[in-house]
Amino acid sequence: MRSPLTVPGFKVALSLIAVAILAGCASVNLEQTLEKANAQTGNFTAGQLNLSQTDQQRDERLQAASKLLTSVVGQKEAVQLALLNSPAMQAMLAQSWADSSLAAQSGRIANPVFSFERVRAGEELEFGRILTFGLLDLITLPYRKGIADQRIAQSQIRLAAEVVDRTTQVRQSWVRAVAAKQSLAYAKQVYENAEAGAELARRLEAVGNFNKLARARQQTFYADAATRLSAAHQQEISAREDLIRLLGLDDNQAAQLRLPDRLPDLPKQARQPAEVAKAASNGRLDIQLAQSALNVSAKAQGLETINSFTDIELGVRRDTVFDNGSGSKSNPRGYEIDLRLPIFDWGGMRRDAMTAQTLAAANQLEAVTRAAGSHLRESYSAYRTAYDIARHHRDEVVPLRKAIADENQLRYNGMLIGVFELLADSRDQVSTVMAAINAEQQFWLADANLQASLVGRPTGTSIASPAAAQSGGAEGH
């Protein structure tokens, strides 16, 4: 008896499958994917984006994270810590790997189906063997591979965009946490100042040297300072805990986290428009992502035009029939074709849906392209405005307030003003410093947003109006 594999029909089937396999199938290499993501987001990850797949790799990550926590964590170190330590970051990388693998799977040919049957009819015994595979799937394999490649590329771009979003969140959260810590220190000074004023007013009233109205004003300042201190304390906790969550720190690691006492100094000069435009021209992820979505839709539309009409399956068959009555044996063989007939459904709605999806992707690409320049202009304007405001506080407002404080100190020493005037001026000076801290915070938030905008992932930054300086309303005696 001849083997089924020697039947010409089977040879043809196996030849077609072999050709399809040799033609190449879509595949995903995790290391190459991460290398590409690091190349696209080098200014954000410094090439340290990596997925731990073994216990040894996880231990190495934890050791590196622990080493970073032994010193004060700056903004750059915070990003490194998130890349090394955050389970959410690792989950994002693993999910991207899964999405790319599923995209690659869609570009591969389905496995053939082998069927075996045994039938007895009287004295006849028949064994049937059928090898079936999707003929249309085989014919359209190059198209499906092209779609899979586009989906893999789309997944890689999406990964880069998510990495930029995540690192930008870490940068901005670090800025808020440090600014909140710095503001809390000055809020404590205001509170201590107001507390001293309220206590002095109470004692002066007790000996008849202060009226009730003046004492009530000092007590009001003290109560307001206590409220502001509580709010600043809660704001510092919230900002720090937000950063802890983004870094993926556990309780022990959170206890080790040390942040700087103040924000970094402003750069000597703001970035110039020409420099920003040059950096932005190197490629925007939002446009790349929209373009890849259009490419996927366009290729899928061409394939759906064929698949929506019909489906074809080819089966190669070889049977063995034993006739016990005559003692003979026969080996009928042949093939069968399964064809789905488009009688009730011609696939018009599926084709319309694909056409609409492609049209939507094309218009989305146009919308993203048109909005790109607007987002960049807005981000740069916010950056430059925040820089100018912060520099104005540093170079003008704070020095002027210090000069006023120095002059009032001299006047107090000469007994030209009382202690309450001096305390009120001290409160105003601290309030000015806190406004300067807020201005620096706005700048560094805008700086992080601008860096994200250069690659097409703006987060949006609003510049808060500076609060008007409030005098302590000093009362003499």
Q: Model-found features: residue ranges?
A:
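Periplasmic alpha-helical coiled-coil/stalk elements that build and connect Gram-negative outer-membrane
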Residues: 2, 141, 157-279, 379-382, ...
